[in-house]
């Protein structure tokens, strides 16, 4: 088998994921029909479902990929810096709209919610490790448990993503992030 032929399934899978991300972001989970997924990916329904089985598994694959990517960025830079990056260059964070769809599915689909917990745990662990590391360095406040700081940052992130994805004004958001950072940092 040639190298090019060997690469084709991986490329096809990645092309499907990229097209599906655009489709879910534009039309939402419910609006991302098979026809729209075919158009967005440039692949047949047979190719799409060969790789992912069904629409839910395709969506979960996107969610898993996005959670892993975000966990990597969080572990290096912290969640507030991720939000600063989103504010400065929202196009780089194409997963924002998909994350909104994930939130909607979590509210309405208990089966999806059960499957999502494993994917979210990757991101949660990255945030906890980062917070713990910063506590050990003496940079974080210690009068509240790490879990409370984590929940606070996650809540801010969800609102931040919602605001950016819906096109609401970003005026003052940089100062809001300064406030968030000051809130979780050690007080002198």
Swiss-Prot record:
SUPFAM superfamilies: Homeodomain-like, Tetracyclin repressor-like, C-terminal domain
InterPro entries named among the record's database cross-references: Homeodomain-like_sf (IPR009057), HTH-type_TetR-like_transc_reg (IPR050109), HTH_TetR (IPR001647), Tet_transcr_reg_TetR-rel_C_sf (IPR036271)
Keyword tRNA-binding (UniProt): no
UniProt effect for mutating residue 66 to A: No effect on DNA binding
Keyword hit for Nucleus: no
Single GO BP term: regulation of DNA-templated transcription
Residues annotated as binding citrate: 79-80, 130, 134, 185
Regions recorded as binding DNA: 33-52
GO molecular function, one term: transcription cis-regulatory region binding
Alphabetical UniProt keywords: DNA-binding, Magnesium, Metal-binding, Repressor, Transcription, Transcription regulation
Effect of residue 109 to A: No effect on DNA binding
Record-listed Mg(2+) binding positions: 181
Phenotype of the disrupted gene, per the record: Deletion of acnR leads to a 5-fold increase of the aconitase activity. Overexpression of acnR leads to a 2-fold decrease of the aconitase activity.
Domain HTH tetR-type: 10-70
Annotated signal sequence range: none
Impact when changing residue 65 to A: No effect on DNA binding
Self-association state and partner proteins as the record states: Homodimer.
Role played: AcnR negatively controls the expression of the aconitase gene acn. Binds to the imperfect inverted repeat in the acn promoter region.
Name of the protein described by the UniProt record: HTH-type transcriptional repressor AcnR
Species this protein is from: Corynebacterium glutamicum (strain ATCC 13032 / DSM 20300 / JCM 1318 / BCRC 11384 / CCUG 27702 / LMG 3730 / NBRC 12168 / NCIMB 10025 / NRRL B-2784 / 534)
């Amino acid at each position: 088998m040639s190298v090019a032929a060997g690469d084709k399934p991986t490329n096809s899978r990645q092309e499907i994921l990229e097209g599906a991300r655009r489709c879910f972001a534009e039309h939402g989970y419910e609006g991302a029909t098979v026809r729209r997924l075919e158009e967005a990916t440039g692949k047949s329904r047979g190719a799409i479902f060969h790789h992912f089985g069904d629409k839910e598994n395709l969506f979960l694959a996107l969610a898993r990929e996005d959670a892993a990517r975000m966990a990597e960025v969080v572990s290096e830079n912290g969640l507030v810096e991720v939000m600063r990056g989103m504010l400065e260059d929202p196009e780089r964070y194409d997963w924002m709209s998909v994350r909104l769809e994930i939130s909607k599915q979590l509210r309405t689909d208990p089966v999806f919610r059960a499957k999502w917990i494993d994917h979210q745990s990757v991101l949660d662990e990255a945030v906890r490790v980062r917070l713990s590391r910063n506590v050990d360095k003496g940079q974080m406040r210690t009068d509240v448990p790490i879990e409370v700081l984590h929940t606070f940052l996650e809540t801010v992130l969800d609102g931040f993503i919602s605001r950016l994805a819906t096109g609401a004004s970003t005026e003052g958001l940089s100062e809001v992030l300064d406030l968030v950072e000051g809130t979780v940092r050690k007080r002198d």
